[in-house]
Amino acid sequence: MAIGLIGRKVGMTRIFNEDGASVPVTVIEIAANRVTQVKTLDTDGYRALQVTTGTKKANRITKPEAGHFAKAGVEAGRGLWELRLADGDGEGIEVGAELNVDIFADIAKVDVTGQSKGKGFQGGIKRWNFHAQDMTHGNSLAHRSNGSIGQNQTPGRVFKGKKMSGHMGAERVTTQNLDIVRVDAERNLLLVKGAVPGATNGDLIIKPAVKA
Protein backbone atom coordinates (compact mmCIF):
# COMPACT_ATOMS: atom_id res chain seq x y z
CA MET A 1 0.00 0.00 0.00
CA ALA A 2 1.84 3.10 -1.26
CA ILE A 3 0.18 5.64 1.04
CA GLY A 4 1.97 8.40 2.90
CA LEU A 5 1.47 9.51 6.49
CA ILE A 6 1.86 12.72 8.47
CA GLY A 7 4.38 12.72 11.29
CA ARG A 8 6.27 14.99 13.68
CA LYS A 9 10.04 15.32 13.89
CA VAL A 10 11.13 14.39 17.41
CA GLY A 11 14.88 14.75 16.90
CA MET A 12 18.02 12.80 16.08
CA THR A 13 19.89 10.09 17.95
CA ARG A 14 21.88 7.01 17.09
CA ILE A 15 21.40 3.29 17.41
CA PHE A 16 23.82 0.41 17.02
CA ASN A 17 23.26 -2.31 14.45
CA GLU A 18 24.13 -5.98 14.82
CA ASP A 19 27.73 -5.31 13.79
CA GLY A 20 28.13 -2.67 16.49
CA ALA A 21 28.28 0.20 14.00
CA SER A 22 26.69 3.50 15.01
CA VAL A 23 23.79 4.51 12.75
CA PRO A 24 22.54 8.12 12.90
CA VAL A 25 18.73 8.16 12.86
CA THR A 26 15.91 10.68 12.94
CA VAL A 27 13.00 9.78 15.21
CA ILE A 28 9.61 10.58 13.67
CA GLU A 29 6.43 10.29 15.72
CA ILE A 30 3.51 9.17 13.57
CA ALA A 31 0.33 9.28 15.62
CA ALA A 32 -2.81 7.81 14.07
CA ASN A 33 -3.75 9.62 10.85
CA ARG A 34 -7.54 10.01 10.79
CA VAL A 35 -9.22 10.11 7.37
CA THR A 36 -11.46 13.17 7.07
CA GLN A 37 -12.33 12.93 3.37
CA VAL A 38 -11.90 10.50 0.49
CA LYS A 39 -11.61 12.17 -2.91
CA THR A 40 -12.57 10.16 -5.99
CA LEU A 41 -12.46 10.54 -9.75
CA ASP A 42 -16.23 10.91 -9.89
CA THR A 43 -16.55 13.71 -7.33
CA ASP A 44 -13.20 15.51 -7.51
CA GLY A 45 -11.49 14.43 -10.72
CA TYR A 46 -8.63 12.72 -8.90
CA ARG A 47 -8.05 10.23 -6.09
CA ALA A 48 -6.72 11.33 -2.72
CA LEU A 49 -7.08 10.95 1.03
CA GLN A 50 -7.47 13.96 3.29
CA VAL A 51 -6.15 13.24 6.78
CA THR A 52 -5.60 14.93 10.11
CA THR A 53 -3.48 13.99 13.10
CA GLY A 54 -2.73 15.19 16.60
CA THR A 55 -5.02 17.48 18.57
CA LYS A 56 -6.07 21.12 18.57
CA LYS A 57 -7.55 23.27 21.33
CA ALA A 58 -11.29 23.70 20.97
CA ASN A 59 -11.05 27.50 21.11
CA ARG A 60 -8.66 27.45 18.14
CA ILE A 61 -11.01 25.56 15.83
CA THR A 62 -13.05 27.63 13.39
CA LYS A 63 -16.70 26.84 12.72
CA PRO A 64 -16.00 25.54 9.18
CA GLU A 65 -13.26 23.27 10.57
CA ALA A 66 -15.53 22.04 13.36
CA GLY A 67 -18.25 21.19 10.86
CA HIS A 68 -15.80 19.40 8.58
CA PHE A 69 -14.40 17.25 11.39
CA ALA A 70 -17.89 16.55 12.76
CA LYS A 71 -19.11 15.42 9.34
CA ALA A 72 -16.21 12.98 9.16
CA GLY A 73 -16.83 11.83 12.72
CA VAL A 74 -13.22 12.31 13.81
CA GLU A 75 -11.49 14.34 16.50
CA ALA A 76 -10.17 17.70 15.32
CA GLY A 77 -6.46 17.60 14.53
CA ARG A 78 -3.71 20.19 14.23
CA GLY A 79 -4.11 20.49 10.46
CA LEU A 80 -5.35 18.92 7.25
CA TRP A 81 -3.18 17.24 4.65
CA GLU A 82 -4.00 15.65 1.31
CA LEU A 83 -2.26 12.52 0.07
CA ARG A 84 -2.64 11.68 -3.61
CA LEU A 85 -3.46 8.07 -4.48
CA ALA A 86 -2.26 6.10 -7.47
CA ASP A 87 -4.51 3.59 -9.19
CA GLY A 88 -5.14 0.66 -6.90
CA ASP A 89 -3.93 2.41 -3.73
CA GLY A 90 -6.20 3.11 -0.80
CA GLU A 91 -8.98 0.78 -1.88
CA GLY A 92 -11.43 0.17 0.95
CA ILE A 93 -10.30 3.11 3.09
CA GLU A 94 -13.31 5.08 4.30
CA VAL A 95 -13.89 8.36 6.12
CA GLY A 96 -13.15 7.93 9.82
CA ALA A 97 -10.54 5.22 9.29
CA GLU A 98 -7.19 5.42 11.07
CA LEU A 99 -3.83 4.87 9.38
CA ASN A 100 -0.88 3.95 11.57
CA VAL A 101 2.90 3.67 11.27
CA ASP A 102 2.71 -0.10 10.74
CA ILE A 103 1.87 0.47 7.06
CA PHE A 104 5.64 1.04 6.64
CA ALA A 105 6.50 -2.39 8.06
CA ASP A 106 7.22 -3.88 4.62
CA ILE A 107 8.80 -0.76 3.07
CA ALA A 108 12.57 -0.27 2.93
CA LYS A 109 12.95 3.36 1.83
CA VAL A 110 10.88 6.53 2.21
CA ASP A 111 10.82 10.12 0.98
CA VAL A 112 10.37 12.73 3.73
CA THR A 113 8.99 16.21 3.03
CA GLY A 114 9.07 19.13 5.45
CA GLN A 115 9.72 22.84 5.75
CA SER A 116 13.42 23.61 6.01
CA LYS A 117 14.77 25.77 8.82
CA GLY A 118 14.48 29.47 8.03
CA LYS A 119 17.85 31.24 7.91
CA GLY A 120 16.71 34.76 7.08
CA PHE A 121 18.56 37.04 4.63
CA GLN A 122 21.83 35.42 3.55
CA GLY A 123 24.59 36.23 1.09
CA GLY A 124 25.55 34.35 -2.04
CA ILE A 125 28.31 32.33 -0.37
CA LYS A 126 25.99 30.72 2.19
CA ARG A 127 22.87 30.66 0.03
CA TRP A 128 24.30 29.42 -3.29
CA ASN A 129 27.78 28.15 -2.34
CA PHE A 130 29.54 30.92 -4.28
CA HIS A 131 33.33 31.05 -4.07
CA ALA A 132 34.66 33.73 -1.72
CA GLN A 133 37.03 36.36 -3.06
CA ASP A 134 40.57 37.04 -1.83
CA MET A 135 40.95 38.07 1.78
CA THR A 136 44.07 40.12 0.88
CA HIS A 137 46.09 40.80 -2.31
CA GLY A 138 44.54 44.20 -2.82
CA ASN A 139 40.96 43.26 -1.97
CA SER A 140 39.68 45.35 0.90
CA LEU A 141 35.92 45.73 0.31
CA ALA A 142 34.56 42.74 -1.61
CA HIS A 143 35.59 39.63 0.33
CA ARG A 144 32.13 38.04 0.36
CA SER A 145 30.34 39.96 -2.39
CA ASN A 146 28.71 38.11 -5.28
CA GLY A 147 31.06 39.43 -7.96
CA SER A 148 29.85 40.25 -11.44
CA ILE A 149 26.08 39.90 -11.91
CA GLY A 150 25.52 41.68 -15.20
CA GLN A 151 26.16 41.38 -18.93
CA ASN A 152 27.37 44.09 -21.30
CA GLN A 153 25.76 47.21 -22.70
CA THR A 154 23.52 44.67 -24.38
CA PRO A 155 21.28 43.51 -22.75
CA GLY A 156 22.24 46.07 -20.12
CA ARG A 157 20.31 44.41 -17.32
CA VAL A 158 20.49 41.55 -14.85
CA PHE A 159 18.65 38.44 -16.00
CA LYS A 160 15.65 37.29 -13.99
CA GLY A 161 16.43 34.37 -11.71
CA LYS A 162 20.06 35.40 -11.17
CA LYS A 163 21.43 33.78 -8.03
CA MET A 164 21.99 36.58 -5.54
CA SER A 165 21.63 37.37 -1.85
CA GLY A 166 18.17 36.95 -0.38
CA HIS A 167 15.86 35.00 1.89
CA MET A 168 17.13 31.48 2.58
CA GLY A 169 15.30 28.48 4.00
CA ALA A 170 11.72 28.15 5.24
CA GLU A 171 10.71 26.35 2.05
CA ARG A 172 9.29 22.94 1.20
CA VAL A 173 12.10 20.38 0.89
CA THR A 174 12.03 16.64 0.20
CA THR A 175 14.81 14.25 1.16
CA GLN A 176 14.60 11.09 -0.91
CA ASN A 177 15.50 7.43 -0.39
CA LEU A 178 16.00 7.39 3.37
CA ASP A 179 16.42 3.89 4.78
CA ILE A 180 13.88 2.77 7.37
CA VAL A 181 15.86 1.51 10.35
CA ARG A 182 13.01 0.59 12.68
CA VAL A 183 9.21 0.70 12.88
CA ASP A 184 7.97 0.89 16.48
CA ALA A 185 4.21 0.41 16.23
CA GLU A 186 3.71 0.34 20.01
CA ARG A 187 5.11 3.85 20.48
CA ASN A 188 4.07 5.16 17.03
CA LEU A 189 7.67 5.84 16.05
CA LEU A 190 9.51 5.57 12.75
CA LEU A 191 13.31 5.65 12.72
CA VAL A 192 14.96 6.62 9.43
CA LYS A 193 18.67 6.78 8.66
CA GLY A 194 20.07 10.28 8.34
CA ALA A 195 18.59 13.76 8.60
CA VAL A 196 15.20 15.06 7.47
CA PRO A 197 14.18 18.66 6.66
CA GLY A 198 13.00 21.07 9.31
CA ALA A 199 13.26 21.83 12.98
CA THR A 200 12.26 19.73 15.97
CA ASN A 201 8.47 19.34 16.28
CA GLY A 202 7.99 20.24 12.61
CA ASP A 203 5.35 18.43 10.58
CA LEU A 204 6.58 15.89 8.03
CA ILE A 205 5.02 13.99 5.14
CA ILE A 206 6.43 10.47 4.86
CA LYS A 207 5.82 8.52 1.68
CA PRO A 208 7.24 5.33 0.15
CA ALA A 209 10.26 6.27 -1.98
CA VAL A 210 9.40 6.93 -5.63
CA LYS A 211 12.93 6.07 -6.80
CA ALA A 212 13.53 3.00 -4.62
Curated annotation (Swiss-Prot):
One of the GO BP terms on file: translation
Gene: rplC
Gene3D superfamilies: 3.30.160.810, Translation factors
Family: Belongs to the universal ribosomal protein uL3 family.
Function, in words: One of the primary rRNA binding proteins, it binds directly near the 3'-end of the 23S rRNA, where it nucleates assembly of the 50S subunit.
GO molecular function: rRNA binding; structural constituent of ribosome
Residues annotated with N5-methylglutamine modification: 153
Protein name: Large ribosomal subunit protein uL3
Organism, as annotated: Shewanella piezotolerans (strain WP3 / JCM 13877)
Record note on quaternary structure: Part of the 50S ribosomal subunit. Forms a cluster with proteins L14 and L19.
InterPro entries in the cross-refs: Ribosomal_uL3, Ribosomal_uL3_bac/org-type, Ribosomal_uL3_CS, Transl_B-barrel_sf
